């Protein structure tokens, strides 16, 4: 063991166990629902083991590992210093219930030089290990139940001479951040998993997607995630339209869509890819598809260059009339007349429709010479209708009342009736 490094067993004890060494002796097995990880480990019922980035370079006491971690089903040992396949063999042998193993970003020997036991793992994470195809093939041969393989942050050699399938059980492959520039490099990896269903190639500088013969040999491939790639042309999506088995597509955050609105992104992708059933995690209903296909036709009607799918959709829906654009945003100004017979006011002005009715009355105050507190306001519309403003309308903005050019405001001054105080009666005066 190198100076400064630790063993897996020692790290496990330090993180999950007390200092009492007797704790690893035989303990009566009981139910452990709700126990802390420390207690779970001490009672040999720990199921989740997280020892990533702890400078582990070897296993340590394998018997102790078997005792403490016999019920572990998920182990995260990523970002350590494990390099020997004998240590991987020890993990697989002594963790019989292991289902998920992360040994990513460990400096594993590129050649397997130790016999590995058959394991029941169903997910293996090998991110950043840079293992050649031959080594992957040998490793996965002892993992007959693996269905999910993580190989992100790896560099792959297009000239690798291993042409045989790496695994026939893997259904999901993660190839994120692998530096892929060409689609052929992606297919060079994916083709080695003939029963693959889902492929992730996120955050690669990939600029295009190209249909090729290898795709036809992958009949179960139905999910593709291209998030944060560098795809910048519709040609790639036209190529995807030829990959008819892919019905679930994720393409958020790609340059191609940057200049489009959310509505345009949705409709132009669905309209282009007739076989899609799910886009960016949302199911596509039959109503959504028809709406998108009609949008697609209208979008390209006036453009000289029309995509391949355009004719197919014209045959399906026919030539569509262009939709009339109706601006429903509120007007900001109107040209109106201000009328006040008492003050002989009759003038045409341009008013803002943003202020409230009360604020507008305050604006009219000096113009018509009627105090806003004594003002009665009417709206005379050009079509002959008349609206009067009550106190309940005072806090509403003017645009709420659909004021149009040519309408008039009539201002009247409220008549304030004052009552005179009755003079004191002579009787009351004399009695006092």
Swiss-Prot record:
Span list, region Ubiquitin-like (UBL): 324-415
Alphabetized UniProt keyword annotations: Cytoplasm, Cytoskeleton, Leucine-rich repeat, Repeat
Stretches forming LRR repeats: 69-94, 95-117, 118-140, 143-167, 168-191, 193-217, 218-242
GO MF: alpha-tubulin binding
UniProt superkingdom: Eukaryota
LRRCT as annotated region, ranges: 254-295
Cellular component, GO annotation: cytoplasm; cytoskeleton
The UniProt record lists the keyword Repeat: yes
Record's protein name: Tubulin-specific chaperone cofactor E-like protein
């Amino acid at each position: 063991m190198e100076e400064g490094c630790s063993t897996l067993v020692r790290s496990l004890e330090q993180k999950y166990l007390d200092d009492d060494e007797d704790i690893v002796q035989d303990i009566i097995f009981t139910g452990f629902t709700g126990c802390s990880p420390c207690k779970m480990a001490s009672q040999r019922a720990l199921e989740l083991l997280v020892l990533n980035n702890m400078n582990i370079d070897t296993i340590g006491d394998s018997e102790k590992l078997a005792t403490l971690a016999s019920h572990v089903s998920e182990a995260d040992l990523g970002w350590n210093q494990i390099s020997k396949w004998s240590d991987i063999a020890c993990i697989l042998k002594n963790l019989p219930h292991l289902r998920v193993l992360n040994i990513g970003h460990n400096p594993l020997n590129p050649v397997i030089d130790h016999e590995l036991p058959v394991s029941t793992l169903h997910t293996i994470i090998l991110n950043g290990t840079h293992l050649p195809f031959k080594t992957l093939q040998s490793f996965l041969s002892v993992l007959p139940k693996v269905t999910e393989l993580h190989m992100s942050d790896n560099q792959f050699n297009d000239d690798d001479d291993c042409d045989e399938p790496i695994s026939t059980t893997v259904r999901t492959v993660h190839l994120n951040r692998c530096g892929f520039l060409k689609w052929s490099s992606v297919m060079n990896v994916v083709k080695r998993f003939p029963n693959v269903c889902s492929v992730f190639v996120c955050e690669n500088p990939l600029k295009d997607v190209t249909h090729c013969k290898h795709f036809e040999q992958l009949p179960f491939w139905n999910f593709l995630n291209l998030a944060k790639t560098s795809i910048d042309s519709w040609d790639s999506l036209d190529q995807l339209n030829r990959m008819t088995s892919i019905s679930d597509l994720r393409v958020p955050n790609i340059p191609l869509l940057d200049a489009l609105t959310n509505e345009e992104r949705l409709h132009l992708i669905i309209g282009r890819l007739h076989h899609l059933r799910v886009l960016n995690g949302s199911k596509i209903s039959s109503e959504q598809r028809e709406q998108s296909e009609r949008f697609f036709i209208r979008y390209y009607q006036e453009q000289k260059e029309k995509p391949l799918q355009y004719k197919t959709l014209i045959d399906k829906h026919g030539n569509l009339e262009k939709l009339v654009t109706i601006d429903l945003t509120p007007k900001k100004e109107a040209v109106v007349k201000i009328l006040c017979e008492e003050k002989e006011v009759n003038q045409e002005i341009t008013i803002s429709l943003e202020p409230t009715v009360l604020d507008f009355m305050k604006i009219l105050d000096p113009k018509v010479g009627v105090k806003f507190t004594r003002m009665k306001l009417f709206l005379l519309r050009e079509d002959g209708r008349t609206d009067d403003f009550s106190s309940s309308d005072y806090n509403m903005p003017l645009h709420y009342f659909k004021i149009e050019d040519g309408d008039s405001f009539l201002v009247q001054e409220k008549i304030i009736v004052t009552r005179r105080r009755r003079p004191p009666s002579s009787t009351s005066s004399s009695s006092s």
